[in-house]
Design a protein with these regions (language model features):
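Short active-site oxyanion
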Residues: 26-32, 105-109, 157-158
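Short amphipathic alpha-helix with an adjacent loop that forms part of the alpha/beta core around
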Residues: 67-75, 150, 210
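Conserved helicase motor
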Residues: 56-64, 137-140
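Glycine-rich, flexible N-terminal cofactor/catalytic loop recognition
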Residues: 1-61
Length: 275
């Protein structure tokens, strides 16, 4: 087979979703770069396929050293790249390997398949015409709040990953950043036996998921209403002008007039934001 790098999606919870092409690539690849070699071998066993190539680990903490090595191998061999679940390069260092390969003229091909991002988006019932994948929110409170705050005005549907242990505090932080009324969906254990999908407002979800849960989590959040997004920007500008020395009431009036909002709405929202 042609020397190249092959990115292949693996099941995110249901082995029945493994494609015939995935099984074929596992059997034929000269080298298999797996996020966790033991989990990969377990998956191959369940799928009834026997890898014929060398199996190497490839994950975030060895990517800097292993990536260039895999690229060199791909000049003369077929290198299959897989993660524990889903598509390599999504919340995964695989994209850097692809970037290097493209720059070096090494062929890259993709075996499509299961994706937690698209599965969560599809089952959420939220708008799919425009969306963004935001990965995991930062673990530390201050960094997480700034991360989410910067997305408060994002008009596209947003998809996040989260660990079961941090889900309660992340939902609470989303309530603060996006508002309790923003529609969202918590997706747990997608495609698995105990799959759970709960759509409600962020406030309701934060109340429901107060304790740690089990399983893989994706959270889908509706984009901001355009008017609310404009108001959020106006509030930030007003507070910035106040910090520069202008009275908040005057700052709100100035910004409201410029963007076409009611000065009362901007002023009251700025007071609420300031606390």
């Amino acid at each position: 087979m042609e020397p190249s790098i092959v990115l292949a999606a693996t099941p995110i919870g249901n082995d029945g979703d493994a494609s015939p092409r995935l099984k074929q690539e596992i059997e034929r690849a000269d080298v298999i770069a797996a996020e966790d070699t033991r989990r990969f071998l377990t998956l191959a066993g369940r799928l009834g396929v026997e890898p014929s190539g060398r199996i190497l680990s490839y994950y975030e903490h060895n990517e800097a050293d292993r990536g260039p090595y895999l690229l060199e191998l791909a000049r003369t061999q077929r290198v299959l790249v897989v993660t524990d679940a889903g598509m390599p390069s999504v919340s995964d260092p695989g994209y850097r390997l692809v970037a290097r390969a493209r720059g070096a003229g090494v062929p890259v091909t993709v075996v499509p398949g299961p994706s937690a991002v698209l599965t969560a988006l599809a089952t959420s019932g939220l708008a799919t015409d425009r969306f963004s994948f935001e990965g995991f929110a930062p673990r530390k409170g201050g960094e997480r709040d700034r991360f989410l705050g910067a997305l408060a005005g994002e008009p596209r549907t947003m998809v996040f990953f989260e660990s079961p242990r941090r889900l309660p505090e992340t939902l609470a932080a989303m309530v603060e950043a996006f508002g309790a009324d923003r529609e969202a969906c918590v997706c747990r254990e997608l495609t698995k036996t105990h799959e759970e999908v709960v759509r409600a407002s962020l406030g309701e979800l934060a109340g429901r998921f107060r304790a740690d849960v089990l399983g893989e989590i994706a959270v889908v959040v509706a984009g901001a209403d355009p008017l609310a997004a404009d108001l959020g920007v106006a509030v930030e500008e007003s507070l910035a002008l106040e910090a520069a020395g202008l009275r908040l009431k005057d700052a709100a009036a100035h910004v409201a007039g410029r963007v076409g909002l009611r000065k009362k709405d901007v002023y009251e929202a700025a007071i609420a934001r300031r606390g």
